Amino acid sequence: MQELLTLQPIVRVNGTIHLPGSKSISNRALLLAAQALGKTCLINLLDSYDVRYMLDALHKLGINYCLSIDRRSCEIDGIGRPLRVDTALELYLGNSGIALRSLVAALCLQNKNIIITGDKRMKNRPIGHLVDALRQGSAQIHYLEKDNYPPLLLQGGFYNGDITIDCSLSSQFLTSLLMMAPLASQDRCIFVKGRLVSKPYIDMTLAMMKSFGIVVQHDQYKIFYIKGKSQYRSPGHYLVEGDATNASYFLAAAAIRGGTVRVTGVGSNSIQGDIRFADILANMGAIIRWGVNYIECTRNSLCSIDIDMNALPDTAMTIAIVALFTYNGVTTLRNIYNWRIKETNRLVAMATELRKVGAIVVEGKEYLSIKPPNMFKIAKINTYDDHRIAMCFALVALSNVSITIVNPKCTYKTFPDFFKLLKGISIT
């Protein structure tokens, strides 16, 4: 039987949210620290399903670490070299895209048989562009069920020089190559084919690699120059920023039904591109204030917007909900075709669920247009086991109707405390 959570109408939000660690940073930091020379203490690590999958995989790969009781700090004994195993094994990564993809690349530098797999949805998320690039470097990779999708059998072999990667579907393919390439035996260039989606995530990856001692040069994100036979070095302590994507839900709540909400743990100096969500809210009319370690949002009249969201696909979903509360016209989110290969087909799912609450929605191949409802409808929201759909549609409770979320615990993928924190700033 499916679990349901009904949220009653929220009259006002006000308060401060201390953000848990970023999922994207947490999993990158774990992999970098594991391969770095020296011991690294990760602070404000996220405790979620995606991070636990990465930790479990690293344990199976022989990495020693010690978690604090609350799992928010982790001390890792880095091995100072690429990951290796003494025997064949299988790694299960659930539906964690960054964990699975980054480990696929990292484990092409060793020569034991390793099977990498995930849940049903992960087996329908394409990985062919990454596999094609790794095979250019002589990596031995075999599809075990259907071409271009996990599960995969890895047999090592990555060696040869320059490679070309298609990043039109996911920047995680390039991130995976960038983090692996310095540990390979040769210098190389990585050429980016086509349009690079979600470019801010590449900036995040490069900033984190720099913190672990590796600097990568690039030419306008088209060519990346990697020095081989390099070594990651522990920074000693590494602070995981609060999750800027998850901050978007609370900033949006304030823009819709504030009061004022401040999110802490992320601010003007963040390495996360999703902090730019606050600028989009400001362009829609919200009042935004910045600090080094916080972003604050106060309610104001919100207008519709027509915007290319290719760089910020996750927070584009939050904008789709904000669009329900605008006072004029239609909001159009463009260039979001890669929504279709996320945790679910988010273009179809968002269009379907937005219509349930009364919006008039046009779903194109690469865009979504949303006209606010004349009157909000009480609805039961299918989440498709997608954490972001659950969190986005919780904000519909900021209207004058209740909203029911199916399978609310899907948020445990990246934000187990989401509903608790939302309740803490809400007046019903």
Swiss-Prot record:
UniProt-annotated binding residues for phosphoenolpyruvate: K23, G97, R125, Q172, R346, R388, K413
Major localisation: cytoplasm
Keywords assigned by UniProt, alphabetized: Amino-acid biosynthesis, Aromatic amino acid biosynthesis, Cytoplasm, Transferase
Pfam families cross-referenced by the UniProt entry: EPSP_synthase
PROSITE patterns (UniProt xref): EPSP_SYNTHASE_1, EPSP_SYNTHASE_2
Residues holding 3-phosphoshikimate: K23, S24, R28, S170, S171, Q172, S198, D314, N338, K342
EC number: 2.5.1.19
Compartment(s) where it occurs, according to its Swiss-Prot or TrEMBL record: Cytoplasm
An annotated Gene Ontology molecular function: 3-phosphoshikimate 1-carboxyvinyltransferase activity
Biological-process GO terms, alphabetical: amino acid biosynthetic process; aromatic amino acid family biosynthetic process; chorismate biosynthetic process
This protein's pathway: Metabolic intermediate biosynthesis; chorismate biosynthesis; chorismate from D-erythrose 4-phosphate and phosphoenolpyruvate: step 6/7
Catalytic activity: 3-phosphoshikimate + phosphoenolpyruvate = 5-O-(1-carboxyvinyl)-3-phosphoshikimate + phosphate
Xref: NCBIfam families: aroA
Family: Belongs to the EPSP synthase family.
Function: Catalyzes the transfer of the enolpyruvyl moiety of phosphoenolpyruvate (PEP) to the 5-hydroxyl of shikimate-3-phosphate (S3P) to produce enolpyruvyl shikimate-3-phosphate and inorganic phosphate.
HAMAP family found in the cross-reference section: EPSP_synth
Name of the protein: 3-phosphoshikimate 1-carboxyvinyltransferase
The encoding gene: aroA
